Amino acid sequence: MENKAVNVANKIMYHISRENNWNIGDVLIAGERENQFWSICKDYSPRVIVDGKEMSIFQMIDQVSNFEVTQNNITFLYQKLKDVSKEMAFYIREQIFEDVRSKHYPMLPSRQKCLWVCEEDQIAYWKTMKEDCQCSLLTLELNGELFCGDDHWLTADTFSSVDYTDRAKHYWNGEMSDAPRKEFLFYGKAIIKEIISIKALR
């Protein structure tokens, strides 16, 4: 069964933005170019400081034999492995999800170009994902196309393209889990109606 995005007009929804240079009345156009999330994801190439020297992860790996076996070094290496694994899982997931969308669901908004928005009753959940940043909650008036997916299918806990392909089909079909965490992908024009600091929300 073909899944389609829903056309919306003057619909009020919300977006949590890491940028803080917005003004009421500003217009956001989604769907024409890559969004910030994907731009950062595809360009991920971490640098680390080892003995006061900045280097790439691969340069650090080449020097592992010189590391003393101390708890601090073990903790340091574990944290870097955790960080890199997480980001690589994100990248593989997003690339596979886009491949599946473009081949089988081309009528739906791309996660690489969309604007993520949520409904009012979802703000509290998505706020917990952004509490480590100086973010703003934007109240938006939307005119365009909207797709609803379940964040449940986006769990980044594997490097397997087979697993992500299966999850992507569930996601793009709009299937909801028993306890769905809804997210909305938007293409079109969004007008900023209100701006509130995330930290000001209770």
Please place each PLM-identified region on the residue numbering:
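Conserved NAD+-utilizing ADP-ribose enzyme module
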Residues: 2-11, 17-89, 110-113, 122-136, ...
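Short linear interaction motifs
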Residues: 88-112
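Short His-Asn-centered micro-motif
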Residues: 117-119
